[in-house]
Every structure is written in structure tokens, then in C-alpha cells.
Amino acid sequence: MKKIAVDAMGGDYAPKAIVEGVNQAISDFSDIEVQLYGDQKKIEKYLTVTERVSIIHTEEKINSDDEPAKAVRRKKQSSMVLGAKAVKDGVAQAFISAGNTGALLAAGLFVVGRIKGVDRPGLMSTMPTLDGVGFDMLDLGANAENTASHLHQYAILGSFYAKNVRGIEIPRVGLLNNGTEETKGDSLHKEAYELLAAEPSINFIGNIEARDLMSSVADVVVTDGFTGNAVLKTMEGTAMSIMGSLKSSIKSGGVKAKLGALLLKDSLYQLKDNMDYSSAGGAVLFGLKAPIVKCHGSSDSKAVYSTLKQVRTMLETQVVDQLVDAFTDE
């Protein structure tokens, strides 16, 4: 049985969206048990009672505006810290939260701990592409500043995840840069390029540009945390703007626009599904001793369900154990 701890109080729509996502996952997957950390009365309001879900009542909650490291140190009885501690103590095998990203990163690093040999765990998510396949990108903001050796390690981590969790036999690894030529970029990216090109364990395809990200040019995209976070938010904003603009144009376009939308209904739904982050799961803080996964702050029950499904796959494939072995062998 796979044991997953969940922060029921994190996110914009907690605990309702969190608990409803858990209800669906418990219904669909008979091999998982969930520990919900948070306000028991609020959780019980939405929970479908089952022996495979337990509630650990907590009085404290880390808020979105709390200073991350300070909150983790001071709010030791919060749903987030206790959930992370459950993983450290072996009570749970993985932890999910839609709460304060910085605090979750701090809890992951200071409570759960990083794998020996991993310098900087990276925040990694599967991003949408127009063909629906997606690509893994890291770092998405766990580290604001990175060295070339960090990017080199991200490439190894990302390739390992794409192969062992997403089932891509030979993942194509690209370095996000301001041009595709080998000589492009600042000193950081030039040095990183040399390290990646010389790394025998990955299939490095060279530099890639941001404009090509959604065209499935790579399976893994490596970047520094500052740039990665900016790209993530740009992609989210662009997707929302495109869908909003289409909807507005159809509504205001009269009968012809509505008829055209009706004829294109299946294609429009496919586009919406391909651009939907909620079906891909959460962002993994990869490089820690256990799966620690961040749901989007505005996650609905579908996104929570997808994240539980993602974590279940990570536990099933034992990707973290394999990663520990890989770094031990180096």
C-alpha cells in the first residue's frame, strides 16, 4: 500500500478542493492510503469516509504571505511541517501540498533532506505542448541563482525522471537559451552547454529557444530557477489569455462565430485539454529523499487528483530509490 501525506489546508480552495481530489483518487486507486493534515472539522465536511483515509488534526497553518524558512521553524505543528515530518519519520512515503511554495521547499530541504550527491534539488513540472505530450522543465524557481554545474545536474535529474516516470526511453534534453547556436548565451550557459555536451548519461540536443517550447522540441528543458519561474508564469498567462480571448470572440461574434465554434467544438476542447496544467500533476522538488510535490495554488479537485496519480506513479516506479542508487554509484 502506498502511503501519501497531504496538506489539506494549503491552496486557494482548501480544504474543499483538496479533499474532493483525495475522494476521487481513493475511489480510483485501491493501492493508496492518504493521511490528511489539517483542521479535522473542516476536512470531515467534504470527506467520503473510508478506512484508507485518516485525518491528523492540526491547529496551525502556514499562510501564503508567511516568510518561508521562518514559518517552517516556528510553525512546527502546521499541516505542512507535520506532513513533511511524516515522510521523514517513515509514516508516509510522499507529501503533497498546494500551500506556500517557499515554505514547502524549505520543509523539503530541512525536514525531508536531499539525496547525497545532489547539490541543489530542482523544482520540476511537466509542461503542456500543442501535441499533448508535454515536457519536463527544471528549475522552476527552487533556486533563484544557479551555476553551470547545477544546470548539468538538473539535466541528469530531469532525464532520469522522464525516463523512469514518464516512460520516455531516450529523453531529449535541451538547454533553454537565447539562440540555438552552440556559441549563444552568457558565460553561465556556454559553460553549461559544454558540460551537457560531454555528459554521456543524457541525450543532449543542444540549445533551444523559448518560442519553441510548446512544439515538443525536447522532452526535458533545463534552465536556471529565475528564468524557469518566469517562463512558467508566462506560459500559464498566455494559455489563459488565449482561451479567454477565444471565448470572448465567440460570444461577441454573432451567429456565424457561434456556428463556427460549434463545428470546431471537438478541436477547441482538444486544445483546451492540451493546454490544461491540471491534468499533468504538480511540480516535484526532485533530488530529495522522498517525493515532495507542489500543487498549483489555485488547484481544483482535478489538479489534486492528477497530483495524487502522479505521486502514485513515482512510488510505483520507485524513482527516488533508483535516483539514490544512481548517485551512490557515481
From Swiss-Prot:
Gene Ontology BP annotations: fatty acid biosynthetic process; phospholipid biosynthetic process
Enzyme Commission number(s) of this protein? 2.3.1.274
Record pathway: Lipid metabolism; phospholipid metabolism
Tell where it localizes: Cytoplasm
- In Swiss-Prot or TrEMBL terms, this protein is called Phosphate acyltransferase
The molecular function terms of the Gene Ontology recorded here are: phosphate:acyl-[acyl carrier protein] acyltransferase activity
Quaternary structure and partners: Homodimer. Probably interacts with PlsY.
* Keywords assigned by UniProt, alphabetized: Cytoplasm, Lipid biosynthesis, Lipid metabolism, Phospholipid biosynthesis, Phospholipid metabolism, Transferase
User: What InterPro entries does this protein map onto?
Assistant: FA_synthesis (IPR003664), Phospholipid_synth_PlsX-like (IPR012281)
Q: Name one Pfam family in it.
A: FA_synthesis
Keyword Lipid biosynthesis in record: yes
Which GO terms of the cellular component aspect does the record hold? cytoplasm
Gene3D superfamilies cross-referenced by the UniProt entry: Isopropylmalate Dehydrogenase
Reaction catalyzed: a fatty acyl-[ACP] + phosphate = an acyl phosphate + holo-[ACP]
Family named by the database record? Belongs to the PlsX family.
Q: What is its main location?
A: cytoplasm
Primary role: Catalyzes the reversible formation of acyl-phosphate (acyl-PO(4)) from acyl-[acyl-carrier-protein] (acyl-ACP). This enzyme utilizes acyl-ACP as fatty acyl donor, but not acyl-CoA.
SUPFAM superfamilies attached here?
Isocitrate/Isopropylmalate dehydrogenase-like
